[in-house]
């Protein structure tokens, strides 16, 4: 289902990010970002999300690719911060695969209502 290289690079990036989280380095952007705390990581994810939207709005495929890569990277940093592995995301996507998006969304709404 997945592109082996894409799966590999995502997993490799995640491993490096976790390494920087667990063994901070002074010369590491990731270590620096993670040491600033979750709020700073969330701020970066928000910034990168906005940049993706702007690149898409401007209909610039090269810029959009660049910004999507930045967003993906910062999502991996957030995942490492929260100790959520790429395999957990893959498992959730596989669970949803083949299910109507409307059906899946309705099941989440019902689940939320059940917990209210």
Protein language model features and the residues they cover:
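Flexible "arm" and connector segments at domain edges
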Residues: 1-68, 72-116
């Amino acid at each position: 289902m997945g592109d082996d290289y894409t799966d590999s690079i995502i997993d490799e990036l995640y491993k490096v990010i976790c390494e920087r989280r667990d063994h901070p380095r002074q010369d590491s952007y990731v270590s620096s970002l993670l040491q600033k705390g979750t709020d700073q990581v969330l701020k970066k994810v928000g910034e990168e999300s906005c940049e993706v939207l702007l690149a898409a709005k401007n209909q610039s495929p090269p810029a959009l690719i660049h910004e999507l890569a930045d967003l993906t990277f910062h999502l991996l940093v957030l995942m490492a911060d929260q100790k959520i592995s790429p395999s957990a995301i893959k498992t959730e996507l596989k669970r949803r695969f083949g299910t109507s998006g409307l059906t899946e969304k309705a099941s989440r709404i019902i689940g939320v209502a059940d917990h209210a």
